[in-house]
Amino acid sequence: MNREQAGKALVLIPARMASTRLPGKPLADICGLPMIVQVARRAAEAEVGRIVVAVDHPEVFAAVSDAGFEAIMTRVDHQSGSDRIHEALLKADPQGEAEIVINVQGDLPTIEPGPIRAALKPLENPSTDIATLTVAITDEHEKTNPNVVKVVGSPLSQSRFRALYFTRATAPYGEGPLYHHIGLYAYRRRALETFVSLKPSALEKRESLEQLRALEAGMRIDVEIVDSVPLGVDTPADLDKARRILSARA
């Protein structure tokens, strides 16, 4: 990341109250703070740009604002996280000053600053439309687990490759590493605007992976390799683990 990128980047954190496995997830207490505030704090530690939380409930709006972070109310009926991010972008930056949009998921309260910064690195190449992250798989079970999204790509360097496909299947075939995709994205503003204007694609619907819409439309996604998968909080057990991690850091 260079200074020019940092000055033109906007970090958007979507926070959705309607979680089936963990109702009220953004407000879940982690070490005395709502989870969404912990995520905003982690994003602030990365020092990559202005931070805005895209919320869909007044209680979350109040929690974020009370903690000193910027919140924007968005619709509750968005079909995807990208649509919510786009609405928040238009409201937060109507003048179009932010050239890069970083989407940090609102259920990553323990994420380190490093991966957030790493997501910007592929955008140093002006040909890259979207950047994202991945980790080499070391657990054999993950290779066949459809809930672990794999990314298949063409190497650009030891730490980066160009995405050719994302899949829930075990791929690619043969000897060599497999990679676990991390759903943290950095978009060029124009790429996000193009993406949300497209209809869901055939492969996107088949795999239930919206990033395939971008690939099918000919957009370029480059992937930075990082060391570990951040904990996503989806269940009460995940929440307990996040509490232990942040308590140990205190």
UniProtKB/Swiss-Prot annotation:
GO BP annotation list: CMP-keto-3-deoxy-D-manno-octulosonic acid biosynthetic process; lipopolysaccharide biosynthetic process
Any GO CC annotation of this UniProt entry: cytosol
UniProt KW keywords: Cytoplasm, Lipopolysaccharide biosynthesis, Nucleotidyltransferase, Transferase
Catalytic activity: 3-deoxy-alpha-D-manno-oct-2-ulosonate + CTP = CMP-3-deoxy-beta-D-manno-octulosonate + diphosphate
Protein's cellular compartments: Cytoplasm
Annotated EC: 2.7.7.38
Pfam families: CTP_transf_3
Recorded GO MF terms: 3-deoxy-manno-octulosonate cytidylyltransferase activity
Pathway where this protein functions: Nucleotide-sugar biosynthesis; CMP-3-deoxy-D-manno-octulosonate biosynthesis; CMP-3-deoxy-D-manno-octulosonate from 3-deoxy-D-manno-octulosonate and CTP: step 1/1; Bacterial outer membrane biogenesis; lipopolysaccharide biosynthesis
InterPro entries for the chain: Cytidylyl_trans, KdsB, Nucleotide-diphossugar_trans
Top-level class of the enzyme under EC nomenclature: transferase
PANTHER family, alphabetized: 3-DEOXY-MANNO-OCTULOSONATE CYTIDYLYLTRANSFERASE, 3-DEOXY-MANNO-OCTULOSONATE CYTIDYLYLTRANSFERASE, MITOCHONDRIAL
Family statement drawn from the similarity comment of this UniProt entry: Belongs to the KdsB family.
Function: Activates KDO (a required 8-carbon sugar) for incorporation into bacterial lipopolysaccharide in Gram-negative bacteria.
NCBIfam families named among the record's database cross-references: kdsB, PRK05450.1-1, PRK05450.1-5
Protein name in UniProt: 3-deoxy-manno-octulosonate cytidylyltransferase
